[in-house]
Every structure is written in structure tokens, then in C-alpha cells.
């Protein structure tokens, strides 16, 4: 597969065309950002780790009947993905109160929610990705009621699968954000990435009651280096994948 011209560059990834019109080339970057890009730093090896972690998670989800846009990992920081038309939407699932949910609703961080909360945020940097509801999305022609009738149950299935996956490696899935898109034939797919950049992950191995972050909150809150945490997530996921018969890159 030949990598052609750059189509897009975001905060954490670059997207390229390939010689197959239905396949794109993704390059993961070493940059980490917070606060709508106001805080930024490069971490050597982060792109490689996020590429590995996304590949592992998408492979584990596939074993559980959930398809993604992933075609194959093709290099340390690169992967091939199916071309999809993305919804300009961040889809957030919350299992435990944290982050924006706490500041918005005055809830103490760490409280277990009685049921998972599904939220939508419009992807718009100028407006700081505002929180929107179903009616907003339909009124603004971001998606249709029929789209939402597919997106919501798929998001909840992904949440259930990820809770189970992370529980197997002694990690609590606090919350996460995902994106979805449609292929040329209209199939709805999980797309973009699932990494410690896009999840809150708390270590459940004994830390004497103290929250041990294994995610980008280490960077957001100046709590420490993210690389050892990302390496730990990658290592545990790789062991789980091997135990399930998934081929893992060494």
C-alpha cells in the first residue's frame, strides 16, 4: 500500500490518502495536548504506544463482535483504516463521575454512576466542543434520528465490552470518548482511536485507596510522565490479547 498526499493533520494524528480510494493511512504523533490545545508537549514514543494500544483494543473488540475502521497496523506509528464519512461528534460514555461531568453538575469525582451516561459533544474547536443533545444534533443536521438510533446502542455495546476488557487487566474504565463514521455502503463503524488519550483509566491494583491514573490526566493535571502509564496499558492489553489468540506485535 502506497502512502500519498496528506489529507488532514489533527492534534494527535495525520491522515494520508493511499493508492486504494477506500483505504486511508494514519500516522500517530508524539504530541499531547490539553485545554483545547493550549497546553502542548511532545513525548518520545507516544505515537508508537497509541498505535499499538488502538490496534489491540480494536482487535479485542472485534473478537467481541464489534467492528471498527481498522484494516491493519503497518508500522510503529502507522495503520491502515477504512475510509469513512465521520460524524463531527464526540461520543462520550461515563461510568464513574470525573472531569467535565463533575465540574458541570457539581458531583464529587469518583462517585459510581447508577447507570452509564451517554453524552454528545459537537466537534468545534472555536466553541470548545460544546455539549449537545439529540434535538440539537438533528436540528443542526449533524445527524438524523435514524443515525442516533444506531449510534447510541453501538456506543453502549462498546462501553460494555470495554468495561469487561479493562476489568480483565485490573483497570477501571471511568469514561471515554469515541467517534463513528459510515463507509461508502452506509455501514456504521467505530473509528478514530481508543487510547489513554481518549479514556480515563484508573489502576485497580493495590494503591492503598489512592487513585492511580493510567491516562492523559497525568499530563492534564501535571501528575507525572504519561509514557510509563501508556506502556503499562499496552503491556497488559498485549498479554490479554495473546491469551485470546490475537497476534500481537513484539
Curated annotation (Swiss-Prot):
Pfam families: SAICAR_synt
Keyword Lipid metabolism among record annotations: no
Pathways involved: Purine metabolism; IMP biosynthesis via de novo pathway; 5-amino-1-(5-phospho-D-ribosyl)imidazole-4-carboxamide from 5-amino-1-(5-phospho-D-ribosyl)imidazole-4-carboxylate: step 1/2
Enzyme class: ligase
GO biological process: 'de novo' IMP biosynthetic process; cobalamin biosynthetic process
A GO MF label: ATP binding
Catalytic activity: 5-amino-1-(5-phospho-D-ribosyl)imidazole-4-carboxylate + L-aspartate + ATP = (2S)-2-[5-amino-1-(5-phospho-beta-D-ribosyl)imidazole-4-carboxamido]succinate + ADP + phosphate + 2 H(+)
Keyword ATP-binding in record: yes
EC number of this enzyme: 6.3.2.6
Record keywords, A-Z: ATP-binding, Ligase, Nucleotide-binding, Purine biosynthesis
Alphabetical list of InterPro entries matching this protein: SAICAR_synt/ADE2_N, SAICAR_synt_PurC, SAICAR_synth, SAICAR_synthetase
Homology family: Belongs to the SAICAR synthetase family.
NCBIfam families linked to this entry: purC
Protein name as annotated: Phosphoribosylaminoimidazole-succinocarboxamide synthase
Species: Bifidobacterium adolescentis (strain ATCC 15703 / DSM 20083 / NCTC 11814 / E194a)
